[in-house]
Amino acid sequence: NQIAIIGNTRTRENVIRRQLRIFPGDVYSQERIARSYREVMMLNFFANATPNILPVSEDKVDIEIAVEEKPAGQASANMGYTQSLGMTGGGGLALPNFRGKGQSFSFSFNIGTNIGGSDSYNYQNLNSNQPKYRTASISFTDPMVNDTKNLLGGSIFYRLQGGGSTAYYSPLLTTLAGGSVMWGRIFKWPDDFFRGTWSFQMARRINQGTEEDLDNYAGGMKQSDGISLTQAIRRDNRDHPEFPTIGSHFSLNSTLSGWLLGGQENFHKHTLNLEWYTPTFWKFVLTNSFKFGVIKELPSKYGGISFIPYNDRFIMGGNGIPYGNPLRGYDDNGVGPLTNSLNPIGGNTMVKIGTEFRVPFAENPVVYGILFAEMGNVWSSNDLMERLNLPRRGPMDLKRSAGAGIRFFMPMIGKLGFDIGYGFDRIDSNGELDPEWKTTLTFGQQF
């Protein structure tokens, strides 16, 4: 008969209604009510959403959906110390339900200084005490413009990184600035769990460093322009955004940079990511993941130099910051091709396989423990079969780790995570096997 929504003190009612899969006048369907509940919860705006069935007559019922709002935004913070970078830290502001309209607005910054740190390079035109890592970005996205299935978004970003020999960043001092625009759409086929986004990005990169490092990391160029198109197709039917117990998440991202679009950064890059969740006994959940990526250089359509920026290649290890490929139990960004001074130079092929056994300790707020085992690696070659017959050099040369961790999703704190992992195949600076334990920590604050 009717559908009423109560408890939405911040979120506008249309944001909730556009997620529903059952409407006034429809035949009663428990399956469609369950799907509506799932869609509302996956917004991640609510601690709970309870559909109540209220009989009206012999053949009619009303549905009342009672929601409980979560904190409106999230302020994140991180801090650490490394020998090369000294103190590192940053923060940001994310409003996933901006103005109560379901739009997302975010701003972030990060900085690393080498106070008390060391440099292997001291370029004549660089101050060795300046930050080696400084980023800022701002973005806005409307996932359902005017309650349609269309998404619109945009972002601008600035990044300065490098300037010294570190286990994290290029020895080049690189400044990157640019922006992007994005359009997306919810699909009807194969099913409405699928959606796609298409983004156009332009950025300018300015590099400073020795001639040798410019050749190794930037194709010998002090300045380059990158113009790219990216397509992202994903399917997500998980039952909960913070602690999924069933369902899967699939994404396929493809980027074309340069070539017909112009610029000096000419390549195509593809990344496949699969995650699936299986309930076992009691409330234990088995989580499996697989990630594969490949990047290949393209010739310049208009002549001139063509290259792939090293930070567009695949870099793995530790917490994965800032390249997005963590591997617990290993040095941060220390897995894959390295220079003689043990700097990551990036690879063209990446594989990662992981398994987690999760057990919930609390539901509201969400707290759960993790037992994990994972393995992965990055290679210079695009051909996984090229070195199959050589020990520790082929596609099965995966760096293995195992360990445990815990996750908290708490009001006024946000996401708090701690992992300790044992890297079975860790190699020291002398090339000798040196397995050991490594820890990682993540922190965020909600308000």
Predicted regions and their residues:
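Structural motif
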Residues: 6-8
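C-terminal structured "cap/appendage" subdomains that terminate the fold
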Residues: 380, 385-424, 428-432
